[in-house]
């Protein structure tokens, strides 16, 4: 159990190191307004904190820096969100000012603004397409036996699919097909489209379209491949280059390489928990992330978690500011999505 004096010194060391990226010595601490102890007392308390594993010495300086244990204690016991500025809030609110809400544009804009506001890398995990429902479908012929199906969901997501017909299709049949699909599938969840086609749509195709069985096979392969996995949106992928810890090109290269691996990124940012989650250094289970911290926050629709937002920064990241930003963005995004899904 740390004493109040040790808690204060640890907090001041971490706050100063977050701002300066420079090891903190007893002389620096003695100049802080909140530190009223003698230099000898400060040195003794720092020695105790080092022995307890909360701070550590660097090779290049006589000062001390926080250890992972120190950051963890800080995050768990000393962290308090900061009040965001009007400029911060204006930028966040700008994400949701568009009259026509399009999910992908909004999510991408969220990622970009978060990276701009933090100067770190942001990753937004979008909702699974299967959690949307079909709003409209268009089919545009591009060759006699080929067309592009444009699927629009209730969230504004647009997906293009190529349909390969076994034989040449008449334009009148394509028009009938579009009318049938929109009439029978509008409002159907995306992951149920294939099932509905073979249970309900098939009888209408049989009645109105010649060679309907060929069309059925083409639709089967088209809708079977509809993407049901989450999409990742990035902001500020190279922002880490601005951090002193990542002036080592080898370290930067390994981190950027990890970020390019979609499955690894999904494992990093998918969170089974609601609210804010903070992983520091080696807690991330990836060697490339041992000098980084990852803060994730979930967003939801009607209390159901459907996606998450993550910020990757150095272990020296400004935790208080990032947590405050994530809380505001996820809250606004959840409200916007709940309104959209309830339409």
From Swiss-Prot:
One of its GO terms (biological process) is negative regulation of DNA-templated transcription. Keywords: Repressor, Stress response, Transcription, Transcription regulation. InterPro entries: GAF-like_dom_sf, HrcA, HrcA_C, WH-like_DNA-bd_sf, WH_DNA-bd_sf, WHTH_transcript_rep_HrcA_IDD. Pfam families: HrcA. One of its GO terms (molecular function) is DNA binding. Negative regulator of class I heat shock genes (grpE-dnaK-dnaJ and groELS operons). Prevents heat-shock induction of these operons. Belongs to the HrcA family. HAMAP family: HrcA. PANTHER family: HEAT-INDUCIBLE TRANSCRIPTION REPRESSOR HRCA. This is Heat-inducible transcription repressor HrcA. The gene is hrcA.
